Regions:
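Formylglycine-dependent sulfatase
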Residues: 1-418, 423, 432-453, 484-521
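Residues forming the ATP-binding cleft of Hanks-type serine/threonine protein kinase domains
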Residues: 429
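A contiguous, mid-protein "functional segment" used to position or interact
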Residues: 441-486
Length: 521
């Protein structure tokens, strides 16, 4: 295929979108007409998973096509090594313009990620990269110790327009402005490309759009909030009376984030705000699609809509992400393209690491053999794909849990291996809300052993977790394990004793927050 005949690619990635909170997934209240129309024009996946339910490692994984443990992307702030190939760089080197607008969460000195051009709104300095080998005082004393419960209680309405130094980013007020500005940039890019095509200068391109909604804080303009509050709210299962059978590591997370015992009015308020954020997000998706159609680009463009991870949204008495429940680690995924089936649903498990080979497949480029993912196109087209695994894999390394976890979804079961703790096991076909942990039942012992054996062909859990803890500064000079949740008295006592006082702070090279631009050469 000649370069001039290659289709274009648009990837729209939201942040923290619960996989079931869309109209095309059968949600009873949510208004997502643009995502619904996109799903009708393409294929949607019901078992799509993030490879890590945290922003930075998920994004570094899907742009490199490698699992987080392959690139040492453990948590927020882990920089991507400049030597790592990204699909954006591979396209650029092949002469295909790759453009990025909005959030990708690059840290360190590799800010462009190989994109030909980008325009991003740089966040506040709290997400600067931290050293690879130095324990980080800021990790325990800084953003990790924020009272996350307060974001729930403060959820609701914000002003439509705010002044924020023209950066469009304000954590206290939410990310509505960020997404409006980023969508403006994406629309301008499409106008440029549409005009070039009309002038006989057609060249293939790929555009990545990183939107912040519906990431916390749960703040949304009044008109979106009023669509749902107070009555159009689906109360989450197991929210008011959290399951007594929660895994002890999940209970650690619940306690660490202070999320227990939310009242029904508090839940209705925050969920209504979240729903409003989804509809606001959908409006921006609609603006991008409308511009594609206006420029006669829609029919010849591959479009991927996805999110970096999900949102617990009150299920199991939890909010945010980090755990292996489907609300957290599951993601929405829609793929539309020329000559692909319309209105199709696929239930086979897939993960976002497949994005890399999918984009290269569209572009007619080869994927390196060390990438664990596979293109979605043969699956969508109904072809044979003998190398595609029949499982989904995800992992988590951070201190909301005291122990790292690794997840497999296979044959209708979800298995989560916790380092130095018992596993969990759910039958997703019979128990889709994941209320009944089967791991302690004798009849599932063989299945647990089979799952663990499979996991160990993918990763060495103990070795990887030790490497992650060392990188994150959670192993002391004498081998002490500082994997502590933020509410632990021991954590506070260590800080009081000055254990971390001599350790390095964030490097200061990054500069002030604001709009950063790289223009195509």
């Amino acid at each position: 295929m000649s370069r001039s005949n290659q289709p274009n690619i648009v990837v729209i990635c939201s942040d923290q979108h619960h996989p079931l909170v869309s109209g095309y997934r059968g949600h009873p209240f949510i208004e997502t007409p643009n995502l619904d129309a996109l799903a009708a024009d393409g294929t949607h996946f019901t078992r799509a998973y993030s490879n890590c339910p945290v922003c930075t490692p998920s994004r570094m994984s899907f742009i490199t096509g490698k699992y987080p443990n392959q690139i040492d992307s453990w948590f927020l702030g882990c920089p991507l090594d400049r030597e790592e190939m990204t699909w954006s760089r591979k396209l650029d080197e092949a002469g295909i313009t790759s453009a990025m607008f909005g959030k990708m969460d690059f840290c360190g000195d590799y800010q462009d990620g190989g994109f030909s051009e980008y325009k991003i709104i740089k966040k506040r300095p709290a997400f600067k990269p931290y050293p690879r080998t130095t324990p980080l005082y800021s990790r325990l004393e800084g953003h990790v110790r924020v009272d996350k419960r307060q974001h729930i209680l403060n959820a609701g309405v914000r002003e439509e327009i705010v002044t924020d130094g023209d950066t469009g980013y304000n954590q206290d007020l939410g990310f509505y402005d960020h997404d409006r500005v980023v969508t403006d940039w994406a629309v301008d890019f499409l106008k440029r490309k549409g005009e070039g095509a009309n002038n006989g200068k057609r060249k293939p391109w790929a555009m990545y759009v990183g939107l912040m909604f519906p990431h916390w804080p749960y703040k949304v303009p009044q008109r979106y909030y009023d669509l749902y509050y107070p009555d159009k709210v689906a109360m989450p299962h197991d929210a008011l009376f959290p399951n007594d059978g929660l895994h002890p590591q999940v209970r650690n997370m619940q306690n660490a984030l202070g999320l227990g015992h939310l009242t029904e009015p508090e839940l209705r308020n925050v969920i209504a705000a979240y729903y409003g954020m989804i509809t606001a997000l959908d409006d921006n998706v609609g603006r991008i699609i409308a511009e594609l159609k206006a420029r006669n680009l829609y029919d010849d463009t591959y479009i991927v809509y996805m999110s970096d991870h999900g949102e617990n949204l009150g299920e199991h008495g939890l909010f945010y992400k980090q755990c292996s429940y489907d609300g957290s680690v599951g993601v929405p995924l829609i793929v539309k393209g020329p000559d692909l089936p319309k209105g199709q649903r696929i239930d086979r498990p897939v993960t976002l690491v497949d994005l890399y080979p999918t984009i290269l497949d569209i572009a007619g480029l080869e994927t390196e053999p060390d990438r664990p993912g596979n293109s979605w196109l043969p699956l969508i087209q109904g072809g044979e794909q003998p190398d595609r695994p029949d499982y989904a894999f995800s992992e988590y390394h951070g201190n909301f849990f005291k122990q790292d976890w690794y997840m497999l979804v296979k044959d209708g079961f979800k298995y989560t291996y916790y380092v130095n703790d018992r596993p969990s096991l759910f039958n997703l076909e019979e128990d889709p809300k994941e209320m009944h942990d089967l791991a302690e039942y004798e009849q599932y012992r063989d299945l647990l052993e089979t799952m663990e054996s499979l996991l160990r062909t993918i990763v060495d859990p103990e070795a990887v977790s030790l490497r992650a803890k060392r990188d994150l500064g959670l192993i002391g000079p004498n081998g002490e394990d500082y994997t502590l949740t933020m509410t632990d008295p021991e954590c506070k006592e260590l800080i009081k004793q000055g254990v971390f006082e001599d350790e390095a702070e964030f490097p200061q090279w990054e500069g002030a927050p604001g709009i950063w631009v790289k223009e195509e050469q």
